[in-house]
Amino acid sequence: MLKTNQKNVHAFEIEKQEPEAVMEFLEKNHALLQYFLIIFKYDIESEVKAVLHKHQLLFLETNRALNGRYIKTTEKDANLLKQNSPNAIEPKTTIYERNIRSGEEIYSTNHLIFLGNIHNGAKIISEGSVSVYGVCEGAIVCFGEYLILKEVKSAQIVFQNKILSLKEVERLLVNKNIKIITKNDDILDIKEVL
């Protein structure tokens, strides 16, 4: 009997563009991209493949359309969905009062609240919103409506499929005040709360 495992995968989909831009993106973000499948919607160039192999990134070349959560819904569509499904289940919230250790990985469809620290080498991936009230040194991938961070010492942060740039991460490092990250269209908004 054939032994198989089913896995859910988070992916970055890259459309045809200049190889130099793709290589720059891969070089800059290779540490964070270790956690994703990179899907190229075209036959990639040999120099791009060399960068992918150099950093041991997992990738796929395909011309096939892939289904997924990349579809943008307008506010009108969202309101219509709410009207048509009043009993829609909201994600639950999970609270972690302990520290998340190096090497620990948490994958969740819930909203997550961390009262302790997230150590370097830990990885958090959540379909819901994430709040971290301790020191954050690990990788965070948040697909929720918001991301709340207090003391950040990590450059490995992804919010709604966007890897935070060095400039955005520097805004988080300024002080230990609580900051909330939201997204309006394609623009990240980082606000200091306290």
Swiss-Prot record:
> What does the UniProt function comment say about this protein?
Cell division inhibitor that blocks the formation of polar Z ring septums. Rapidly oscillates between the poles of the cell to destabilize FtsZ filaments that have formed before they mature into polar Z rings. Prevents FtsZ polymerization.
Query: Which InterPro entries does the record associate with it?
Result: CAP/MinC_C, MinC, MinC_C_sf, Septum_form_inhib_MinC_C
The family note in this entry says: Belongs to the MinC family.
NCBIfam families attached here? PRK00556.1-2 (NF001818)
Q: Name one GO biological process term.
A: cell morphogenesis
What keywords is this UniProt entry annotated with?
Answer: Cell cycle, Cell division, Septation
SUPFAM superfamilies to which the protein is assigned, alphabetical: Cell-division inhibitor MinC, C-terminal domain
Assembly state and interactors?
Interacts with MinD and FtsZ.
Output the superkingdom of the source species. Answer: Bacteria
Report the protein name in the record. Answer: Probable septum site-determining protein MinC
